[in-house]
């Protein structure tokens, strides 16, 4: 009798051990760590059931959970409450493609968000970034990883004329304090894909709150209008500086102008003057629009580029993030 009980106990323990291991492996499969010896970064991987982000606003790929260089940190949770389906439960340099065919689509019919999939228009109101539009087809994601890179590929084959292969590769450059995001959008459908994409750049450098220790330096002298401009922040030459700490509410500069038509002006530096570190952001495509948003826990230049791919064609672009100290 004792032998039987011992045998059953061993089976129960073994089964529990297997379950625990399976669960931990599945959890581990949703994130990956990469390094080039200078920069260390952790990325969350896309998954419709258990992914960190399951909202319908931002591109699901390339979500960087944390990044450190030379003893400094650049990405952390900036929002108060986490919910995988909330539109802003994202971190780091996240991209959003503007919706395609939303305005011409009747309620109950589908529209496209590149990097998310085919979604359903749920009411007559204008498109809202905070609204959850019911997914119809989220496509198929494939992920490849290496020591210093993660490659994300989404394949979408829809019934509404839009199909594509979208690839984003996040790479830590060997021997440099540099991160590159390279993109390819291959139009495999019948309709032209024409939209804008921007990078929200949810940075929080060394956990410094928005205030006089934070500044953004542009490649041109910016001008613009918006909420908080003049009392909380102001333009000083080619810089955007904080006049005081941002304790509540937000800053929203809807339109920043002054840039030229070449990629040279898609360059800015986000700096923490207190800890003497910063991030330089560049792109190989020209700006189509530029905004700036901030709350007390993050400061976000929002640069847009135009994306255009006719059927059978491919559109490419690349962001470069360089981390530095002084």
Describe each PLM feature range:
Residues 2-10:
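Bacterial N-terminal signal peptides that target proteins for export
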Residues 8, 16-18, 59:
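Compositionally biased, low-structure terminal segments
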Residues 13-23:
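Hydrophobic h-region of N-terminal signal peptides that target proteins for export
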Residues 25-174, 178-180, 188-194, 200-326:
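Surface-exposed acidic/polar loop and edge beta-strand patches at domain peripheries
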């Amino acid at each position: 009798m004792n032998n039987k009980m011992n045998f059953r106990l061993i089976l129960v323990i073994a089964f529990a051990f297997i379950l625990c291991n399976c669960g931990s492996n599945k959890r581990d499969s949703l994130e990956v760590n990469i390094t080039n010896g200078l920069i260390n970064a952790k990325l969350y991987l896309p998954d419709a059931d258990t992914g960190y982000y399951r909202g319908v606003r931002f591109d699901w790929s390339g979500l960087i959970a944390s990044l450190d260089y030379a003893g400094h940190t650049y990405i952390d949770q900036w929002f108060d409450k986490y919910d995988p389906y909330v539109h802003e439960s994202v971190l780091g340099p996240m991209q959003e493609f503007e919706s395609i065919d939303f305005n011409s689509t009747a309620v109950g019919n589908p529209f496209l968000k590149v990097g998310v999939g085919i979604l359903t228009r749920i009411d007559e109101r204008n498109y809202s970034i905070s609204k959850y539009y019911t997914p119809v087809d989220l496509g198929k994601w494939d992920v490849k990883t290496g020591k210093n890179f993660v490659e994300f590929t989404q394949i979408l084959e829809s019934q509404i004329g839009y199909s594509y292969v979208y690839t984003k590769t996040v790479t830590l450059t060997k021997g440099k304090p540099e991160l590159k995001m390279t993109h390819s959008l291959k139009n495999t459908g019948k309709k032209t894909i024409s939209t804008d994409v921007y990078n929200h750049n949810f940075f929080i450098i060394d956990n410094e709150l928005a205030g006089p220790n934070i500044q953004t330096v542009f490649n041109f002298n910016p001008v613009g209008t918006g909420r908080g401009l003049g009392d909380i922040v102001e333009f000083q030459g080619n810089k955007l500086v904080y006049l005081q700490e941002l304790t509540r509410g937000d800053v929203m500069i809807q339109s920043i102008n002054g840039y030229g038509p070449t990629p040279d002006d898609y360059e800015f530096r986000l700096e923490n003057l207190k800890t003497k570190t910063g991030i330089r952001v560049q792109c190989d495509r020209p700006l189509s629009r530029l905004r700036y948003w901030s709350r007390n826990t993050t400061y976000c230049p929002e640069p847009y580029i135009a994306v255009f791919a006719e059927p059978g064609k491919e559109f490419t672009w690349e962001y470069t993030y360089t981390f530095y100290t002084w």
